[in-house]
Structure formats: C-alpha cells, structure tokens
C-alpha cells in the first residue's frame, strides 16, 4: 500500500450548480490506525445530489455547511484494509460515509446517527448496489411508493426524474405492486431506457411537445405522483392528478442551487389552489424510514428477477468532481451514478 493517497476537498462554495472548479484534489499521507479503529479502502463512492445542500455559504435550514478545504462527504462502499476493532476483519466489505478519498480511518464506536459502517453481503448482488438498489436510493423509492404513496394494483403512478437512482427503482416497484408506471425524464435515450426497465409510458421534459406527451401518457390522470424535482415539471404534472391523489415528495432538485427564495415568479398561490381544488395529499419523507423490511423486499424482488438495478459508472477518484457536477446539468446517465475508486479484490 502506498504511503500517500488522494482525496477531493471543497475548494469554493458553489454558486448555482456545482462546477468541477469548486473542488480540489490533494495528495496526503494515508492515516494511521488507532485503537478500536478500522482502515477503509474506498472501492465505490456515490455522487448524491443531496450533498449540494452542504455546499452553500448561506445554508438552507437544517443543512450542515462544509468548510473549505474539508474532504467531500458522501456514501461509499469500502474494503476493510486493516482493523483494530473486534467487529470488523480485514477483507470485510462495508457501506458508510467515509467521503471522497482513497483511504479513511473510522472509529465505529463513535458513529453518528446513521450508525457504524454496515457490512455488505456480496452474495446478494454486486457490492456497488449497496449505494443504489440496496442502499439509500432503493430505500427512498420503497418508502415513497409503498409506505407514503401506498400504491395499489391498478393505480397509475407518475414519477419525475425517473431515470435517476430513486426514480428508476420506484417505477419498477410500482410494477411489482401491479400499478401503471409513467416516467418523466430528459432526452430520448433516457426515455428509451425507462421503457426497457418496464415503465408503461414516458414523457420527455426536454421535448417541445412535453405537455402533449404527458397528456398522452396520462389519459385518465394519476393517483400518485412521486416528486423528485419540483419546478416546471411538477407544475406540468399537477393538472393531471386525480382528486385525492397522493404526492410523496422526496426531492426538489430544480431548486437545490437557488437558496431559500427560489428563482422567478412565486408559483405557490397556484400550487395551493391545486392542493385545495383536488384535495391533494402531500407528504415529504426520507428514505431512511424504509428500514430493514424495504431492503429485504427489494433484495427478494431482485433475486426473483422482478427488479433490475441500473448503474452508470465512471472510473477514478479524479472523475468525482465532474461526475457530481453532471448530476445537475442534464447528464445522460441512467440509474445510480457511481465512481469506481479502486477495483474489487
């Protein structure tokens, strides 16, 4: 093992969508292992859009700001390279939040609310799925469709950002439950990928006839709208929701880079009118509430061939800043966007 390693640090707070220049790659010594600590070698890292909340100089309420020069945070899958902790052995594969770096030392006994690094069962699926289908995105999709959306057989569910990690899983879960899945994505390639995953219909929000595509895809409206984006896409969907429709809200990526006020005119009065007129049931949620049952159900569906995991992979830690920036700029990736930092043994 080399005596030094690479890590990606925050060079500047983001203004609008993050740019590669907001980050800096540094070479530092590999950290030394202390008592009851584990040394992790990063295999995979996820460039999650939620990280964006921590990159503003002026924060949204509830977010924790990163300091300039700090190692970028984010979920990872790692191999235990060395261990001074009885619960972990060299060679174990774990999922945690060790950040954008080639190696990290963690003290499992001093973990935050997420708990210590979770061991990954490589017999269930490729270990990278611990960051996607069998990780946070899978839990979020499950929570939104099963527990919050309460989707029933025969219902139509429309999903924004459907080609993303959460959306692509959510549509497949809808199909497992006997529902009709309608996906909204940007570009013909993404829409074709959704149909290949089993979605019943798609609408391309980048197309000039998006409104007509949406009308065609939802001839009788929808009982559930899983909203991942907010913004103009959600404004276009609202007229198609049936009275009493459920609207699980798990993201608003259209606004992640604009601060508290948001851009342009205030659409809230019109939004309120739609809520009142249609008696919409809106609920924000977090995927962590899906818990163990959600992951067990998803693993079972994957084993039965009812759900496929979609991943897009870029190689090398150096690629992480560009990969993260692409999440906010209409990238062509489908499913979970991952950075392969090192090959698996």
Task: Walk through the language-model features, giving the residues of each.
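NAD(P)H dinucleotide-binding glycine-rich loop of Rossmann-like/cofactor-binding domains
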Residues: 72-79, 86-161
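Mid-domain Rossmann-like dinucleotide-binding core that forms the NAD(H)/NADP(H) cofactor-binding site
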Residues: 131-208
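Short, glycine/polar-rich helix-capping loops at beta-to-alpha or helix-loop-helix junctions
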Residues: 102, 186-195, 267-272
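Glycine-rich beta-strand-centered segment in the early N-terminal region that forms part
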Residues: 29-47, 56-100
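Short amphipathic alpha-helix with an adjacent loop that forms part of the alpha/beta core around
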Residues: 209-220
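Glycine-rich phosphate-binding loop and adjacent beta-alpha segment
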Residues: 232-307, 341-345
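C-terminal hydrophobic helical "lid"/dimerization subdomain
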Residues: 2-3, 289-345
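Short glycine-centered segments of the SAM/dcSAM-binding site in methyltransferase folds
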Residues: 93, 156, 180, 245-246, ...
């Amino acid at each position: 093992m080399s005596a030094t390693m690479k890590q990606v640090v925050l060079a500047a707070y983001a203004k609008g969508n993050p740019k590669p220049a907001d980050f800096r790659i540094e070479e530092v010594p590999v950290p030394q292992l202390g008592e009851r600590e584990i040394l992790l070698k990063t295999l995979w890292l996820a460039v999650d859009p939620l990280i964006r909340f921590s990159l503003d100089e002026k924060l949204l309420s509830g977010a924790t700001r990163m300091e300039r020069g700090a190692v970028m945070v984010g979920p990872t899958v790692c191999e235990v390279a060395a261990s001074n902790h009885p619960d972990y052995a060299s060679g174990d594969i774990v999922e945690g939040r060790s950040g954008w770096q080639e190696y990290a030392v963690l003290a499992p006994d001093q973990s935050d609310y997420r708990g210590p690094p979770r061991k990954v069962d490589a017999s269930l699926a490729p270990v990278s799925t611990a960051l996607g289908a069998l990780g946070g995105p899978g839990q979020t999709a499950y929570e939104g469709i099963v527990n919050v959306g309460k989707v029933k057989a025969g219902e139509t569910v429309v999903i924004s950002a459907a080609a993303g990690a959460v959306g692509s899983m959510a549509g497949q879960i809808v199909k497992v439950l006997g529902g009709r899945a309608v996906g909204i994505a940007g570009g013909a390639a993404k829409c074709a990928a959704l149909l290949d995953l089993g979605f019943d219909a798609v609408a391309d929000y980048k197309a000039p006839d998006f409104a007509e595509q949406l009308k065609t895809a939802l001839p009788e409206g929808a009982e559930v709208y899983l909203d991942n984006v907010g913004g103009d896409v959600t404004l276009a969907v609202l007229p198609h929701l049936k009275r009493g429709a459920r609207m699980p809200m798990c993201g608003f990526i259209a606004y992640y880079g604009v601060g508290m006020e948001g851009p342009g005119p205030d659409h809230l009065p019109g939004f309120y009118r739609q809520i009142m007129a249609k008696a919409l049931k809106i609920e924000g949620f977090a995927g962590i509430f899906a818990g163990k049952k959600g992951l067990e159900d998803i693993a079972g569906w994957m084993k039965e061939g009812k759900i496929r995991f979609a991943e897009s992979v870029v190689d090398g830690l150096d690629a992480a800043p560009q990969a993260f920036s692409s999440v906010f700029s209409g990238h062509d990736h489908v499913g979970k966007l991952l950075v392969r930092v090192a090959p698996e043994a």
